[in-house]
Amino acid sequence: MRIKMFAKIAVFTLVISAVFSYCKNNQGVSGVTGWKYNDPAGTDFVVKQGLITQIPMGMVAIEGGSFTMGEKAEFVTQPRDNRQRRITVSSFYMDQYEISNVDWREYSNWMKVVFGKSAPDLVKRSVPNVNTWREQLAYNEPYLQNYFSHPSFNQYPIVGVTWEQAVDYCAWRTDRVNELALIKAGVIKAPNFASLDSMPYDSIRLKFIFSTQKYLLQNSYLPEPGRNARKKGAQLSPKVDMSDGIMYSDYRLPTEAEWEFAAYAITSDKNDIVAEGKIYPWAGQQTRLTDRRNMGRIQANYVRGRGDMGTSGIANDRATITGPVNSYMPNDFGLYNMSGNVNEWVLDVYRPSSFDDVAEYNSFRGNVYVKNKVDSKDSFGREVFEIDSLGRIAFETTEDLRNFKDPDPQAKIPLDTMDISDVLRPVIDERSRIFKGGSWKDRVYWLNPSTRRYLDQGMSANDIGFRCAMSMIGDIPQTKRRR
């Protein structure tokens, strides 16, 4: 009996070894046609093998799942615009910290270097509105003069930026990250910024500026090839595409569902039991730490009460206005300041009834479907796309779904009409964007990640910032999988 058992084990081992050997020897061969991958003598169909998923710099990988989105506490003077709803979000990445002043100054500096001489009006689009610090009955001029520009505030969150500016920043970040990835891979050469002094504006936007979509879709756009540029016959072509695994997906603002899911950081215990119903991004019903070492310390930057900042040396939240983006303890996903410090823009259009209307999976209101603008066709019949003022492919709207299934009559009020029902709030329309999280000037109620407010996408405030997100391509990088 024992000999038979050993024989079976030996046969099984040989079969497994043969399977692994076959797979190893046929990694470069199509499993459906038998033709070789990555064969220059053939069609040169490139298949990236052994790709290890890289987490984008400064981001945290968040595994998606289902959770109960919506109100966790009731406030009688606030409208019930966040009724509970069970939804599911897919896996994504999110910035560990809020975008800081130094992050934004990098963006502003790039815009100034590239467009400062040829198109100075474009540079103004990257400048935050420092006037948001002004209040009629407060002396905030030092913040107006220094908050954005002084190195002492480098790691403080950027404020005074509109939703539109935040979206532009995400697009700029996508292009800069992908440009650097191609440079490091030796596919293209680094841009020569010194050449901008004598370069006309059209050459800058058409040829000098790297844009991810322009690189992928515009056949006439050919950056200078790098040391590892791919050869095709006698021609040196630096072009790669997303299948090469070098470039990243688009940076963007998180959807409201993603932001709330990330803020609560709902995880299971060792028995795979998930406890929902958290009020804040941390455990418990209080805003103070309860562990012995940090007992009594406040866990977020907010206003506890009028005239209740604390006294010199023992300020209750250790911040007068905003605080550094790495202040306080992170939540269970490793994200900092998901409550307090500054409110954060999300991608969604605001509607009081959104929770009743949106889809169960990847809930979102605000879809605007677009297509690239075609300028002409080249001699091969390929489409030549129009390039916009920032050097990106221009697009046109094909379908606007921001008001899709919208029962709210306020959404149909003209922009120049005042909402007489509540003069303290802006009119609700397709430009109303949600911000969440609470800030340095908010009371504790707004620290609940389920609370939501809105502002016109072209307006800014000294307590609203943002962080970026990115859809995850493939599986989440995991060191430990569930049983």
Show which residues each predicted segment covers.
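Bacterial Sec-dependent N-terminal signal peptides
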Residues: 1-33
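Disulfide-stabilized, aromatic/cysteine-rich ligand-recognition loop
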Residues: 23-44, 48-50, 75, 149-157, ...
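Active-site microenvironments of metalloenzymes and redox enzymes
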Residues: 24, 92-292, 296-297, 347-353, ...
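A short, compositionally biased domain-edge/stem linker segment
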Residues: 40-55, 232-241
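Mature N-terminal segment immediately following signal peptide/propeptide cleavage
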Residues: 54-71
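Extracytoplasmic
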Residues: 57, 64, 84, 89-91, ...
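Short loop/turn microsegments at loop-to-beta-strand junctions
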Residues: 57, 249-250, 329-333
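C-terminal, low-complexity/hydrophilic appendages and adjacent surface loops
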Residues: 77-82
